[in-house]
Amino acid sequence: MTKKDKRTICLLGLLSIALVFILTSNVFGNTIDWYSQHVVIADALRHAIRSEGTLFPTYMKQLMGGGNIYHFSYYGYLRPDILIGALLIHVNMQTIIIAYSVLMLTLSVICCYIFLRQHTDNENICIFVSLLVLLSSIFFHSHKQIMFVNYMPYLFLALISIEKKNFAAFTLCGSMIVLHSYFYCIGCFIVCFIYLLYRYPAEWKKLFISYILIVLLTAILTIPTLYIILMNGKS
């Protein structure tokens, strides 16, 4: 990566953060879905983790009159911002989520640029497409329905890992995608598989092994969640 690329990355990052202050009011989020769901549920999740003293609490008394924590895994209860919130229990969860959402938005734009630079020497095209990412629905959902987009930087990082044939890094990125949004991980993994077949079809076995490792690493979240979904379907 050249000095010019590093300078461009810094400018894209600053522009992403500046856009948050320019296009939003005092709070990077709305009072409907964002606050009533994401902030409230995340705050309840971190308190459940603290009260039971484990990352895998079994019961949440704050929501739905009490319920299994895996009813809320759709929101990604093992996300880094929730775990950080459990450590920094005296910090407002709204502040933590806003900071994390801005970070994920910024990283999405930066990782998009880095990914594109692996394929073209035309810096202007890379900047233009990265700006399109910034101005797309990613910005909108970063302060509305955050689980729709908060996995995006990890998807770009997963594609970058495939390009570098670093399947250990891909396994880590894939696991983070699942922990952020298991609902969208299937689509992400299909994209990664298609990209691998396009770039390095002979490496498909390594990718398959990475997928198995991702399933095993995230089983503590996905298997109980699948059980809850099946039980709710029967009822």
How would you name each of these model-derived features?
Residues M1-S235:
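Membrane-embedded transmembrane-helix bundle of lipid-linked glycan/lipid transferases
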